[in-house]
Regions:
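Active-site loop architecture of trypsin-fold serine endopeptidases
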Residues: 1-10, 15-40, 46-87, 91, ...
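Conserved beta-propeller blade repeats
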Residues: 41-42, 129
Length: 320
């Protein structure tokens, strides 16, 4: 590239998640040109202070397309110091999968604003979260005395906190009759290398035998949990309803999780909708029919991720 070149632009977003970024990296978005040869160079503010390291561009051709991303200098400095002093990067670890609270979840659960990280799966039976008693469905709202804005924010806070450190975590739990706020002190573990995110898990579709119901609330064809499925996944047959088919023209077919993947898939098990358990298709249909345009919807959904395991998903959307 051309040496001694300076480009200028505006910052339009901070803490931006990108498809190619790691779970620990949130980028500064700018329209200052980043081309081949100056990636890795500094992003500076008007005072000449380095605020980021140019890292990525959004492009379909390989050339600059008007949007670039820089790693915040604070993150780069933390990694540098660890490499300089210890020769490796160590990150704190909770041992959970997370999703972010959206407006629909906050409305259904009576939260003042859409802040917090929902625990969708406790990953390790002997990990820090499991030892502290956290469960799927808990919402972490504070970490080490600091409010948690989202799943990504919590990941950043945990990863930048050293392993073996004890921290106080505040979380909300639905007891069935009330939302209770709890505090727990936990000792962080060290994140193992090469751990993939939940999006790497591919759902295992199990056979659905009973005849499906004719009604299609939200465009979903639902059926009861089979005895074989209940035994295989170690769940009760009344634990929810199995999604047998999704109408491609339905609203829910376009609903995405925070990670960008489809919210509902065939073989998923819907457990609750707006805090109400659903043991049969008629009950589900009655709840859906009572909803009106603009109402918030939150569903607790289990996804089979192997022959014997499931993982919780929090599906959040608004009735259109």
């Amino acid at each position: 590239g051309l040496s001694r070149t300076v480009t200028a632009g505006i910052i339009s977003h901070v803490q931006r998640d990108t498809p190619t970024g790691s779970p620990f990296q949130r980028f500064i978005q700018t329209d200052a040109a980043i081309n081949r040869g100056n990636s890795g160079g500094p992003l500076v503010n008007l005072a000449g202070e380095v605020i980021g390291v140019n890292s990525q561009i959004a492009t379909s051709t390989g050339d600059y397309n008007g949007i670039g991303f820089a790693l915040p200098s604070r993150d780069a400095s933390q990694v540098y110091e660890q490499l300089r002093t210890t020769g490796k990067v160590r990150r704190g670890y909770l041992g959970v999968f997370l999703d972010s609270v959206k407006a629909e979840y906050a409305k259904v659960y009576g939260m003042r604003d859409e802040r917090g990280a929902i625990v969708t799966h406790v990953r390790d039976a002997d990990g820090p979260a499991a030892a502290a008693g956290l469960k799927a469905g808990d919402v972490i709202v504070e970490f080490d005395g600091k409010p948690v804005a989202s799943a990504q924010d919590l990941i950043s806070k945990v990863s930048s906190t050293g392993p073996d450190r004890s921290v106080v975590v505040a979380y909300l739990r639905d007891s069935g009759t009330a939302i209770e706020r709890k505090n727990v002190t936990m000792r962080l573990g060290e994140r193992p290398p090469n751990r993939t995110s939940r999006d790497g898990d591919r759902p295992t579709k199990l056979p659905v035998d009973p005849p499906a119901q004719e009604q299609k609330p939200f465009g979903l064809t639902l059926t009861a949990i089979t005895p074989e499925m209940a035994t295989s996944l170690n769940i009760d047959r009344t634990a929810g309803l199995v999604v047998k088919e999704i109408s491609p023209e339905s609203l829910i077919a376009d609903v995405k999780l925070s990670s960008g993947v489809d919210a509902i898939g065939e073989g998923d098990i819907i457990q609750r909708i707006n805090r109400k358990p659903v043991a049969d298709p008629a009950a589900f249909g009655e709840i859906v029919r009572a909803l009106k345009k603009g109402d918030a919807v939150v569903m607790h959904v289990l996804t089979p991720v192997s022959g014997t395991q499931t993982q919780l998903k929090i599906v959040q959307f608004t009735v259109q």
